[in-house]
Curated annotation (Swiss-Prot):
Readthrough of the terminator UGA may occur between the codons for 332-Glu and 334-Arg. Pfam families: OAF_C, OAF_N. Embryonic expression is in small clusters of cells along posterior margin of most segments, brain and segmentally repeating pattern along midline of nerve cord. Expressed in embryonic, larval and adult gonads of both sexes, and larval imaginal disks. Residues 434-445 have a biased composition (Basic residues). Vital for proper neuronal development and hatching. This is Out at first protein. Residues 423-433, 456-480 have a biased composition (Low complexity). It comes from the Eukaryota. InterPro entries: Oaf, Oaf_C, OAF_N. Residues 423-487 are annotated as: Disordered. Keywords: Developmental protein.
């Protein structure tokens, strides 16, 4: 159990001990102050002898002092904070800060990702609003500012997070322990449909304007959530819609499919909260036996009390409109991987590349890989020639993939070498270094003959074998293609 709540009886005893210690500290502090002023132990007040404690108890300063302490302690009890060390799926450890505000009925969760992105999640239980703020560091070498801020306001379901009152009562036994969640809730996708005008965002929640002041043009909301908030008491759909501005209806292009940095597109931003308290755990306790109206003794009924929490992990992906692709450069990083995967699948469907990863990427790859392997293994005298062609083609395709990936990741570089030159150099080198069929058969028989003779002497049936090392044509083709890339 990671975080444990205090037992009801234990919490009462703890509060009583804290009150006694505070009273003792207060009395000692004021006794020292009196001794410094050399006040006599007893004084005369209208002919009566009074003590120092009597003076403080009946003075107005003492009453004001108690009132100020109560106010300060109430504010301290209303805000509680936990620092949690969380290990993400990549094995890296980040620190989460979870703050509970009972007076405002708020919970704030904040952490910084390993790439520098600052994530802030605010949950407003009164208005059932969840705000996720992302501060992403910019790429100054590509013309971006130092950072950009986005805010996403969505409908919050009260069962997804423990209440602010329960959060304030949680205590951490070992603050330095690295936490892992008990349950993974997967990924939830939100498609935003409107901007939020922060100067009119009061009908949604009054915390939105202060939290997202740096995201004046980058605060987003969904129409579905507006309709859900309109059903709450004291809210109306007209006031909610007046605080929003809808996206253009004609755009449906993803940013990772757009080449121009100044064209509008749909951006994707994904973030994961690696650890948060998503529910409460209850323990059974012994009840107090009592008597009924007739005086008969009743059996003690077991009672349930809160004794711990359930922890979860959840990822969220937001899809929203940006006026320029320049505001969504992080979505471009997956473009090269996606295109490279599509190229591999297309070549495997044509039978031009063989590999173990074909079945994991393209549908139907297992059948094609098995058929191709069986054909190469049982090819007889022509097996080595097929291996040579397959190895040469695979090497050339990998070089082309590498060049395409570098061009996609560096759009501002001036590449004067076209990709199709690799295929041309491959055909030229293949025509120059291609041996005759008789020479290949002679080499194959010279390699297979000793093996078959040795196998016949041991009275075992011969098995067809293929050469493990690629011939010289593959190495010459690879070297010529690599020289073309370097040029």
């Amino acid at each position: 159990m990671i975080l444990k709540e205090e037992h009801p009886h234990q919490s009462i005893e703890t509060a009583a001990n804290a009150a006694r210690q505070a009273q003792v500290r207060w009395r000692m502090a004021h006794l020292k102050a009196l001794s410094r002023t050399r006040t006599p132990a007893h004084g005369n007040c209208c002919g009566r002898v009074v003590s120092k404690n009597h003076f403080f108890k009946h003075s107005r300063a003492f009453l004001w002092f108690l009132l100020c302490n109560l106010v300060m302690n109430a504010d301290a009890f209303a805000h509680s904070q936990l620092l949690i060390n969380v290990q993400n799926q990549g094995g890296e450890v980040i620190q989460e800060s979870i703050t509970s505000n009972i007076g405002e009925d708020l919970i704030t969760l904040e952490f910084q990702k390993t790439d520098g992105t600052l994530i802030t999640q605010v949950i407003d239980f009164r208005n059932e609003v969840q705000i996720l703020k992302a501060l992403v560091l910019g790429e100054e070498e590509r013309g971006q500012s130092q950072y950009q801020v986005m805010c996403f306001a969505t409908k919050f379901n009260k069962g997804d997070f423990i209440s602010s009152a329960a959060m304030a009562k949680l205590r951490q036994k070992n603050p330095h322990t690295i936490r892992t969640p008990e349950e993974d809730k997967g990924r939830e996708t939100f498609t935003m449909s409107s901007w939020v005008q922060l100067n009119r965002s009061l009908p949604i929640t009054r915390h939105l304007q202060g939290l997202c002041a740096e995201a004046m043009d980058a605060t987003y909301v969904r129409d579905v959530d507006l309709k859900a908030w309109a059903e709450l008491p004291g809210s109306s759909i007209s006031s909610l819609e007046a605080a929003t501005e809808k996206f253009p209806d004609t755009l449906s292009t993803r940013c990772n499919e757009v080449s121009s940095l100044w064209a509008p597109c749909l951006c994707n931003l994904e973030t994961c909260i690696g650890w948060y308290p998503c529910g409460l755990k209850y323990c059974k306790g012994k009840g107090v036996a009592g008597a009924d109206s007739s005086g008969a003794q009743q059996q003690a009924q077991p009672t349930n009390y809160r004794c711990g929490i359930k922890t979860c992990r959840k990822c969220t992906q937001f899809t929203y409109y940006v006026r320029q692709k320049q505001q969504c450069l992080w979505d471009e990083x997956r473009r090269g991987e996606l295109q490279l995967m599509q190229m591999r699948c297309a070549r495997r469907r044509n039978g031009s590349e063989f590999g173990d990863d074909a079945s994991a990427t393209c549908p139907g790859g297992e059948t094609r890989a098995a058929t191709t392997t069986a054909t190469i293994t049982g090819g007889g005298a022509g097996g080595s020639g097929k291996d040579t062609t397959a190895a040469t083609t695979t090497t050339t395709n990998k070089l082309r993939q590498l060049l395409l990936l570098v061009q996609q990741q560096m759009p501002f570089a001036l590449w004067s070498f076209p990709v199709h030159h690799i295929s041309q150099s491959h055909h030229q080198s293949q025509s120059q270094h291609k041996p005759s069929r008789q020479q290949k058969q002679h080499q194959h028989h010279s390699q297979v003959a000793p093996t078959s003779h040795h196998q016949s002497s041991s009275s075992t049936p011969p098995t067809p074998s293929t050469s493990s090392s690629p011939p010289s044509s593959s190495s010459s083709s690879s070297s010529s293609a690599m020289a073309a890339i370097v040029a």
